[in-house]
UniProtKB/Swiss-Prot annotation:
Homodimer. Residues 28-48 bind DNA. The record marks 93-94 as: Cleavage. It comes from Staphylococcus carnosus (strain TM300). Signal peptide: none annotated. GO terms for biological process: DNA repair; DNA replication; negative regulation of DNA-templated transcription; proteolysis; SOS response. One of its GO terms (molecular function) is DNA binding. Its EC number is 3.4.21.88. Keywords: Autocatalytic cleavage, DNA damage, DNA repair, DNA replication, DNA-binding, Hydrolase, Repressor, SOS response, Transcription, Transcription regulation. Belongs to the peptidase S24 family. It catalyses: Hydrolysis of Ala-|-Gly bond in repressor LexA. Represses a number of genes involved in the response to DNA damage (SOS response), including recA and lexA. In the presence of single-stranded DNA, RecA interacts with LexA causing an autocatalytic cleavage which disrupts the DNA-binding part of LexA, leading to derepression of the SOS regulon and eventually DNA repair. This is LexA repressor.
Length: 207
């Protein structure tokens, strides 16, 4: 199933909730009020994208004719073991990594690529080539299990002093921590304190 943006997910979930509770879909105005969009044209744009991605079907001759067509797709996805994992676009200090404000979109992922509870998993897009010797390339999606501790040698996602997420290999040394790139041309990062956001448990690469 094609991934949805955060806003598209909000609209889709609202439509589905209304259809399932009331038996009929909400109006464009109601959708806009529910998700904080004042412009009806913006709502129509999101509905068009949801339709093109196969989540809904609309009848242009009827104002409220929004049919949820992805329920069956979701059932099929569950049978095939597919989960929708949050993709983290930024990391905010003092806020849980999977907080709504950090999530850019949701990405459909085969369940066999994870080895833990779905709620503990998030995805981070890799930027740069600091981990290429570990087989992690620029543009890859690393699958991360949320946790705050790490063992020496673990590949982790850590928060830097600039409040940015970085993927490095973790080592605890005497009186300091070392975040080691897997790139022989790069120097390690030494920190007195480090915030571990999660451990990399898998990798997804789009060909």
């Amino acid at each position: 199933m094609t991934e949805l943006t955060k806003r598209q997910s909000e609209i889709y979930e609202y439509i589905k909730t209304v259809v399932h509770t009331k038996g009929y879909p909400p109006s464009v105005r109601e959708i806009g009020e529910a998700v904080g969009l004042a412009s009806s044209s913006t709502v129509h744009g999101h509905l068009s994208r949801l339709e093109s991605k196969g989540y809904i079907r609309r009848d242009p001759t009827k104002p409220r004719a929004i049919e949820i067509v992805s329920d069956q797709l979701e059932e099929n996805a569950e049978m095939e073991g597919t989960i929708h994992v949050p993709v983290i676009g930024k990391v905010t200090a003092g806020v849980p990594i999977t907080a709504v404000e950090n999530i850019e979109e949701y990405f459909p992922l085969p369940e066999h690529l994870t080895s833990t509870h779905n709620s503990d998993i998030f995805i981070l897009n890799v930027v740069g080539d600091s981990m290429i010797e570990a087989g992690i390339l620029d543009g890859d999606k690393v699958i991360v299990r949320s946790q705050t501790i790490a063992e020496n040698g673990d590949i982790i996602v850590a928060m830097t002093e600039d409040d940015e997420a970085t993927v490095k290999r973790f080592y605890k040394e005497k009186h300091r921590y070392r975040l080691q790139p897997e790139n022989s041309t790069m120097d390690p990062i030494y920190l007195e304190q480090v915030t571990v956001l999660g451990k990399v448990v898998g990798l997804f690469r789009e060909l």
